[in-house]
Regions:
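Beta-strand/loop substructures that line and gate deep hydrophobic ligand-binding cavities in soluble
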Residues: 100-157
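Hydrophobic ligand-binding cavity/cleft-lining segments
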Residues: 1-56, 66
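Glycine-rich portal/gate segments that line the openings of hydrophobic small-molecule binding cavities
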Residues: 40-104
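Short, surface-exposed coil-to-beta transition loops
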Residues: 4-6, 82-87, 109-114
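Beta-strand elements of well-folded, non-transmembrane domains
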Residues: 11-13, 74-80, 92-94, 107, ...
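Charged phosphate-binding loop/patch that engages nucleotide di/tri-phosphates or the phosphate backbone
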Residues: 164-172
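Hydrophobic pocket/interface hotspot
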Residues: 17-22, 28, 70-72, 90, ...
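K/E-rich alpha-helical interaction surfaces of small helical-bundle regulatory domains
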Residues: 112, 160-161, 165
Length: 172
């Protein structure tokens, strides 16, 4: 059985800036709640498709296109020191619209995360609607509903944290 969650937030920044931020794996630990102590262990980047967007040489070297793999570690049950490993792969990428990642190895039987961005005006200000769509499964049979009740709250907490700190991170 697969579970689905969707999170939306709006930030008062242009879509190009927001997309570049999310497409750089180095920003992932900054988006996570500090208690998770998320770290990037290794990254194998595949450059995104060529675009007419002007990128600095640093941006060209740091963005994750299709085929990129990011290995992270995190505290499984904060504040306990036990660390888990997560291997993610970028499977889809369209400039300033979306990218998708799947879990190759980690705590779930399956995990699919689509990061969508939509240019949107609110109160006469141009900004970006950030939409995160997550589908995941545990594969634990009869234990799935119990685990789902616990884990969905934790996932919601992570995305609430991301939504709260994203504007400040984009300022920096």
């Amino acid at each position: 059985m697969s579970s689905h969650l969707e999170f939306k937030s709006w930030v008062g920044f242009p879509i190009e800036k927001v997309f570049l931020f999310f497409a750089d794996p180095a920003n992932l630990p900054r988006l996570m709640p500090p208690i998770t102590d998320t770290r990037i262990d290794t990254v194998r980047l595949v450059p995104p498709p060529v675009t007419s967007i002007q990128l600095t040489s640093e941006q060209q070297r740091s963005l994750a296109g299709i085929g990129s793999e990011i290995v992270t570690s995190f505290r499984v049950l904060p504040p306990l020191p036990l660390r888990g490993r997560w291997v993610a792969k970028i499977t889809a990428f369209r400039w300033n619209e979306f990218f998708e990642d799947v879990q190759l190895q980690g705590p779930f039987k399956s995990w699919h995360h689509r990061h969508e961005l939509v240019s949107e005006v609110r109160e006469d200000k141009q900004g970006t609607l950030v939409i995160d769509k997550v589908a995941y499964a545990f594969g634990l049979g009869p234990l799935d509903p119990l685990i789902e009740a616990l884990v969905s709250k934790r996932i919601e907490g992570i995305f609430t944290h991301r939504q709260r700190i994203l504007p400040d991170l984009l300022l920096g």
